Amino acid sequence: MKRFFFLCAVMAMAFTASAQQSWVNETYNPQANTEGLAPMGARVISPEVHDNHTVTFRLVAPNAQKVVVRGTMFTGGMEAKSAEMTKDDKGVWSVTAGPFTPDVYTYTFNVDGLSIVDPANTLHNHGTMPASSMLYVHGDGPAYYDPNPNVEHGSVTTSYYNSTVTGGLRTILVYTPPHYDPAKKYPVLYLMGGSGEAADSWYKYGQVNWIMDNLIAEGKIEPTIVAMVNNQIVHRSSPNHSQLSFKMMEREYKECIIPWVDSHYSTITNRKGRALSGLSMGGRHTQYIGFRNPELFGSLGILSAALTAADEKAFGEDAVAMGRDAKALKDAAFDYIFIG
């Protein structure tokens, strides 16, 4: 189970996108634009990522008065810093910024006070909040979160189940490792996203399938099933989100998710065969559900899970229940990791 430590730490650094600019091959440098071709319907190439790790951004906006690009590549925060763009005589705004550390970032254009995605960039994230554009600053070769043509690859399946908690149809994505064999038993990592993310975010932007393929090929983890769970169980803007979300997700796991996964895949069905992890809100769900249910999970990965005042209140209301289970927690001997 200690291998889950390594897996969770790796995934915490890799919330990235999995599509590509050219739509031809899965590659580690999808925005290098080696062919010099703009996407169909676009008038400019943007972003254009250069081998020296600088990036050229372009936007056609002849009537705009001011355009800036804002993104996580500058400081790690969307609004903290920006690069002002200049307009040429054809109405094309541009700026070359960087060099940036090879990684995956998000950015937007601000046009006269209006925030928009890059219309020439085919890679956008999506979820339960406004979209932004994805930026790949590639290194000299594939990173641990990139597709690698030299390793074997698993599969990702999108499925649906009926929830007794929400009373509706819910989405779940499941990664199975290369050469998945129903005659064998596999450990399961249950993985959740943050408050603004969709059910498929860990697949499309976290690239968990590439990460798993690479780690399995390197022998750093055993072949593992990953169940990517939709933890958007209450509308994020609901004033009762924190009070309802934790208990509802706990029920969802116990009544729906774990029984569904165990009945559809060849799994190890004891706590040592299950790990629970999540980013941000998913980390808070992990902390709440995992420590309250030590009989279900043997490993926990709590990633960037700062508690809000409302979260603390929700946790506090269950302090008696958690105290009641103190002996169970002591006997459980969790493997767990906190990051960020």
PLM regions and their residue ranges:
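Bacterial Sec-dependent N-terminal signal peptides
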Residues: 1-22
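Non-catalytic cap/lid and distal C-terminal segments of serine-dependent acyl enzymes
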Residues: 20-38, 43-80, 87-340
